[in-house]
Amino acid sequence: MDFPRSFLYAGPQYTTRAQDVPAPLFRRKFIAPAGAQAELVITGLGFYEVWLNGAHLTKGFLAPYISAADDLIYYDRYDLTEHLLEGENVLAIELGNGFFNDPAGYVWDFDRAPWIGAPRTAFRLTLKKDGEETRIESDEQVLTHPSPILMDDYRWGEIYDARKELPGWTLPGFDDRLWAHAMPCEAPSGEARLCEAEPLAVREILKPVSIEKQDEGYLYDFGVDTTGICRVRICGHAGQKIALYHGEKLKGGKFDMDNIKFEHRYGPDDRVQRDVLILKEGENDYTPTFTYHGFRYVLVKGLEETQATEELLTMLVISSALPEVGGFDCSD
């Protein structure tokens, strides 16, 4: 397929060990006639989330897939027809760093990788009606704005400021007059290929089996060591900051991350498997977008005692959505 090579980014700045750069949002408005069909092909380096007119389309977590962009660029295809409106429509995209820029991968020298750069996207939306086609690509009409994700890294985690949320930004009619124009950027040299791998999906939802107050915070135990993220639901005050540290073991009954905090050439790293949420006033509901962790235990810092409830955290167990083709049972 002739995949578009017109890549865009919000700008050349990108997250490093010395600076955090927010995940970018993008909007592309277009007009569609009544009765049209629509198809989208899209990639995001490293990861993307995509919506049409507020409908969340992304196939699964951490789309499209992991690859070295100078060798292979995975893209996805979506049928948009059921979400298409007559008149104004909005394609909305959010980008994360993924493996395209992974400063926390310094243990493997990923912070020195030759392909490192700011997250970028390329897409083509094709409208079809009465035998005619109209192509809408990643072009100079795409607008961009920083998201509430102040920092994201595949291994570190996310910093999310709920006070910076932009209600309605994925919908037509949103006021984007203060948004900037996205900038064209270099297209990676890799071959474009449709991703046919199974998407990452939530396979199980776990509640904590115990909650214990420790010296540094509240310890949530989910009873099994697996991979995923935590959904956070909390009522608090604007500006309150809570931090979730994800670990696999205890030492002397205390939360311990020594097995995953590699020191390497930079010394100890407090950001490994840490998600930070800065609250807005009132109810907050947050799930990380561009990271995942291996853990059984979560140490939550910054909570008031009344906030350390069973409902605070839910573990979303994430893995490839492989079809079940067999099973095994045995007695004890």
Regions found by a protein language model. Give the residues of each.
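Extracellular/oxidizing-compartment recognition motifs
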Residues: 1-332
